[in-house]
A protein has these predicted regions:
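Non-catalytic signal-transmission and effector/linker regions of two-component phosphorelay proteins
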Residues: 1-18, 28-31, 55, 59-60, ...
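Short acidic/polar segment at the start of the alpha1 helix of CheY-like receiver
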Residues: 23-27
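Helix N-cap/capping motif at the beta->alpha junctions
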Residues: 43-52, 75
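Active-site residues of response regulator receiver
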Residues: 67
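Receiver (REC) domain active-site loop signature in two-component systems and cognate sites
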Residues: 70
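As written
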Residues: 75, 105-115
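Hydrophobic/aromatic residues positioned on beta-strands within the core alpha/beta folds
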Residues: 94-96
Length: 161
């Protein structure tokens, strides 16, 4: 089981949010966003790892953010199985709205809230506050969603500074 932790420096850490995505970059960014909002944040690489984490830590996770497009076990199946383990768990599905299969996937999981990816910091904060009933308490500035800047030289012969 691969679980990534985000340490949140807070005297009174918020509820535990588990971020599950098979892609490293969005998983890392969303996990850092959750942590910077003052919530405890953990992440797992896929549905199986998330279920193992939930079984090893019963009733500790308050909210699950799961990507719909994961192989082997999509986020909807994970959400259903996670709710079987802990009915009070709040499960939220994430996906890119441009995904041509999104409507088919969502129709099978209509009972779960949805967050479009890429996730904006403001939208995530609003959604978590509303679903958890606990205001976010940002501990740091939001992580950047911008791609890393290239350090290549410009074709005009000028250097980036």
């Amino acid at each position: 089981m691969t679980v990534e932790d985000v340490k949140v420096l807070s005297l009174n850490p918020g509820p535990l949010v588990l971020v599950v995505d098979d892609e490293a970059r969005p998983r890392s960014i969303i996990t850092r966003m959750v942590g910077s909002l003052g919530y405890q944040a953990r992440s797992c690489h896929g549905g199986r790892a998330a279920l193992a984490f939930l079984k090893a830590h019963p009733r500790e996770v308050r909210l699950l953010l799961a990507d719909l497009g994961m192989p082997q076990m999509d986020g909807g199946e994970l959400a259903e199985r996670a709710k079987d383990l802990d009915p009070r768990l709040i499960a939220v599905l994430m996906a890119d709205p441009a995904d041509p299969h999104l409507q088919d996937l969502l129709s099978g999981y209509a009972g779960f809230p949805f967050v479009p990816k890429p996730v904006s910091f403001a939208d995530l904060a609003e959604k978590l506050e509303r679903l958890l009933g606990i205001p976010a308490a940002p501990t740091t500035s939001p992580p950047s969603m911008d791609p890393p800047r290239s350090r290549r030289r410009r074709s005009s012969g000028q250097h980036s500074v």
